[in-house]
């Protein structure tokens, strides 16, 4: 077999090693056993090869004639390669062995394999494209769809091809992987938005179409929830100097997202409908009725699928995608600014997920569960019946410990089912080693996943709540067993997901049962022999040099030699000269040799051949599975939802949360801040909240640091927790469903957009006023602090009156006590304040402020609490005294409505003139003539200001 293996790859005798080679096979006789096995007749193997090639080339790629594969066949008589010693090191190494050169145009580095591959590849594809993209690193390229677009020369895009990698670090479940196509109607249809999105980790397409206003708030919020990797728009919307307002707003709000423009003709609603009819699985075909007349989302779907097929270099198998329509009315809207203010996903200190609402609730065990939790937090439910069903599940999980721990045990063993499906339903346009390895790996993962269906069903058998019973019913689908049986006729029973790159490599090599392909069995025996030879060679080197050498393996280096010793006593210079690529880590040396590098090359060639033949068998198997694969979408949905509900129940066990009710009133008894509870050593102070339609605006006053902002965030977080189906931190809680949640809390300047604090306030308030309605929850913190007192009071007063008129539930914190008089004009206004206490500080002989963080009725009785806070700080006492005197004088002036005297105006005019002269003397870089003109204008301005200051008539120039 060894001779046949080398002959197929056109190896020459130059591959022979330094020791006397076998005259027949050209390899070193590392062991008499392996040497004897290489005497297999070339004639018989050659005949087998011709038969295999004829069989493969006569069958279409995805519709092969079925090969009878009876169950119960065992592995080939040749044992799997021994991995003892090679398992010691699974870490990746920075250095890598040179890969063998592949034949020109060959996908598998083998002319023979390439010929078989070309003969078998007959699946029609929709678009032509370049060679397959690498699955790990992004490439910059120009797409054919965007040809002719002058402002776009390329983009970078990341496309995952495998569900999991046992040889690399795990990718975050929330790494951007969504591509979105957006199109807007023209003419009278302007404002009608069509969207289509697909997650490259999940084979699901979401379609949306809705009417938006001129602020495009719904579009921006929807994109924020999707967190896209790339956005596709028509090139007519992005013309330089004449781009649409929608394109401008999207680019301003998503600066770090890649944009691709494609020709308008690809936004074709007829083609979009054809795509959906071709790709949508039967169980979700009702979407056709929903979108038949929604032309803009169909157009977006056409452009999206055409583009994804190109960048993925693959097409989706017919009837393999879950396609669904989601309207904008099915979930609550939380804009991106509010999500940031409330710290829903990332905190405002280090921008990580800890100390956020997501961090409080995230005890999920799967990537799908984590993604579902994230999307639910950003888009809470508005349907009370659905929320109540979730709450029933959480309640049963809390009451039944056996169910809780049983589900947790089973769910934690599931892999990322959505990403697994995404890879399985894609058909590569060009077969590569990566594509073959990915399909084999994910078929093993699919087997692992299906084997967990029965344990999950057993755990749910005795559940009583409707939702859990529904999930149990979905698991009784006979197709799970049917798919698993088909897989087991081809895949070994002991082929399973394992940690460690060498473990997983072995699983892939021996995934297919023996006797299904005789040529595959021969190739695997060859691989076994090569691995045994490597182990034997290293054992001989250890004996030859009397060193404690052992075989190790990493994904980057392949097999290499490792030695644990006292590196101080034995330097690298003292190692034998044939050891090369020496690296030292602590008390361990890692190195290889020229012979071992050649053996690794042969091992890789053997793997390529095994992967290719296994891939062809897997493709035949997948063609039989595709018609039943629809049930896996239900399984994916079941697992992710159960994982999220378990996470809610887990969070409840760590704190005294209560089940919320849903009425027309927002009533919270002794509620507290969930994030603050997690990061504080002590339990936060609890407060009551009561808002109804007859009292829908709360004006909240109190000193700085008394807890006003924290209280506002607490209310919003509790509202979101209730609407996603979680228990809430309170003794009792009743909520009115909020269709939108708006906040205006941040007061930082926006340097990037050159916005001051006040301008940012006005933009955020304008956004709220344009989009709020009677189903909104609005939280406004200290509006008007960015301008002078009079204007701040006026703006705050007007905003409050508008919010009073639309009946939105509003909490408004302020330092402007004048707003508290609104309750005299409007019966639906309530005044609240945070209490503080004054404690005598004996050491400094001053009063200290004690913050109670308790909310009480009425307006605050504290006066000049800013001065008291300054006095309690390290500010010098002389400055505090001056400030108090000045405050007293200013207050008196305001009360008496006094105007400044002419003498003060004269002094101010002189002061302004002197200041400008000093600035000109210090900093001016003007030319003499321009400086002379500037000083002349300054003199004229002073001459005009001074007479007005002293009450004299102005002089006019002749």
Curated annotation (Swiss-Prot):
Key words, A-Z: ATP-binding, Chromosome, DNA-binding, Meiosis, Nucleotide-binding
Keyword ATP-binding: yes
Localization terms from the record: Chromosome
GO CC entries: chromosome; condensed chromosome; condensed nuclear chromosome; nucleoplasm; nucleus; recombination nodule; synaptonemal complex
Transmembrane found in the keyword field: no
Main location: nucleus
Pfam families: MutS_II, MutS_III, MutS_IV, MutS_V
Sequence positions that bind ATP: 702-709
CDD domains associated with the record: ABC_MutS_homologs
Biased composition regions of type Polar residues, renumbered to the chain: 124-138, 146-161
Tissue localization of expression: Predominantly expressed in testis.
Stored SUPFAM superfamilies: DNA repair protein MutS, domain II (SSF53150), DNA repair protein MutS, domain III (SSF48334), P-loop containing nucleoside triphosphate hydrolases (SSF52540)
GO molecular function: ATP binding; ATP-dependent DNA damage sensor activity; mismatched DNA binding
GO biological process annotation, one example: mismatch repair
Subunit structure: Heterooligomer of MSH4 and MSH5.
Purpose of the protein: Involved in meiotic recombination. Required for reciprocal recombination and proper segregation of homologous chromosomes at meiosis.
Family assignment from sequence similarity: Belongs to the DNA mismatch repair MutS family.
Record protein name field: MutS protein homolog 4
Gene: Msh4
